[in-house]
Amino acid sequence: MKRPLEMAHDFLAEVVTQDDIVVDATMGNGHDTLFLAKLAKQVYAFDIQEQALEKTQERLNQAGLKNAQLILQGHETLDQFVTEAKAGIFNLGYLPSADKSVITQPQTTIEALEKLCSLLVKGGRIAIMIYYGHEGGDLERDAVLDFVSQLNQQEYTAAIYRTLNQVNNPPFLVMIEKLERYRHG
């Protein structure tokens, strides 16, 4: 059985091509940025911590990839850089090996999700990894689930992939796809 993050990558890899623009809304250590840079024409990656940009740039340099723009800003500013996207990924929580008090916040995450949903091309996808074992994580989890469950079913489909028998608040995946065409009825 695949872990949620593996499923997230597979979910995006099914639709992303070398012609596409994609977003890594939470750069972190750069694993998702690197993954997306191998698939897409251009990656826009966001983080508010300088350490994240440094680690990600190092990872991209080692792979010889130059198709990622690393942006030291919150993901809620993504619409200042991106006009349309085929895919996006969020890893909510905190940057491992960094200050664990610096966490993603419900209001900016929802703002970023709203913007990315509107910028998604038809057939585009968003993968949201929700880590919620830290203080404040449950509030963000609930805000994201509330937002996603209210997306118009004529325009989007959404699903959750999670383990049921794991302890200690295991992370889970929320998947959103913008439908190719509106459904009726």
Residue ranges and their predicted role:
Residues L119, G123-I130:
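Conserved beta-strand signature within the Rossmann-like core of class I S-adenosyl-L-methionine
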Residues M1-I21, E54-E84:
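S-adenosyl-L-methionine
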Residues N29-A40:
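Conserved SAM-binding loop of SAM-dependent methyltransferases across substrates and taxa
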Residues Q42-D47:
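Conserved SAM-binding motif I beta-strand of class I
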Residues T17, L65, L120-K122:
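Helix-to-beta-strand junctions that scaffold the AdoMet/dcAdoMet cofactor pocket
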Residues G137-G185:
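Class I S-adenosyl-L-methionine
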Residues G93-E111:
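Mobile active-site "lid"/loop adjacent to the S-adenosyl-L-methionine
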